[in-house]
Amino acid sequence: MQPMPLKKRRFYFYVLSLVFFLAIPALIFYESGYRLGDSFNFVKTGGIYIYSPESGSEIYLNGDKIEETGFFLKDFFVDDLKPGKYSVLISKEKFWPWAKNVTIKEGMVAEAIAFLIPKDPEGETVPKNIEEANPAETETSGKTATTKKKPEANPEYLRILSLFEEEKINKEKVVKSNTLAKNPADESPATSSPEKTEEYIYEKVSPRGKVGLWREGNQILAKWLKSDRSLPYYFCEGNNENCREIIAIFNSASVVRSLDFYPGRDDVVVIAVENGIFAIEIDSRKTQNFQPIYKGVDPYFIIDGNTFYVKDKDAIIKIKI
């Protein structure tokens, strides 16, 4: 085999050297998080942080399954994403799906924190009365006669009923105070209070004390109670842009009968409206997820820990989430 001519070797050397030196900047750009954009210009990539509270949830990005959450690992970070719009879908069998459209900007990380509500949550009716397991028996002429005792009120039913009464009184006080704060001219001198300020009284405060809720008519509003510098993404539009301390969460055509935070969440609110109880997220990026918890006739609710107590007409239902 004859050796390659010197001229040819030099040619290959120069070509390969040129390729090598051209590739170095491209590799540096790539390692620094830059990619070739749609307009053939270099753009810095971003990422998205995704969290699902339920283990066994399937996470989809633009229709492609990218992860399934485990018992301990419930969050996932996707990096090296070109700027643009992405759709996130999180689903789990027997739960309502959660979806969100997220915009990724250059060098920014977007957040998508889901909530998943069971389609058929466990529930049981709290009886009004304690039924006698064994009715009293007396012997009459060799025959057994059964005597029924007067039904005894169920203490648990009465306790829960009193909680609903307390909730109703508290709501009426808050609504009245906020109405007067908004329209001080409506307050008569006899009912005026020297300690009253223009600040609203919050009907509910989130579990971690970060968000306050109140209503104006049928509109639900939320206020961030911590430092303005720490406003979370769900008080902002897009990637922490146009952030506001006070935002409107929901505007109902019907009366909102009950209002509270979803257990353990600062960013999910539960409302009773029309014939149902629903969870709605504060995050208004499309789509603002709205998931049913209970459907009945005319329900009210209170929350104790992770238990929902629903009062629908005379019935009280205990629902575990």
Each predicted region: which residue ranges?
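Short loop/turn segments that connect beta-strands within beta-propeller blades
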Residues: 226-228, 282-285, 321
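Beta-propeller fold detector
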Residues: 231-249, 288-295
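Short loop/turn and low-complexity linker motifs enriched in small/turn-promoting residues
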Residues: 1-196, 218-219
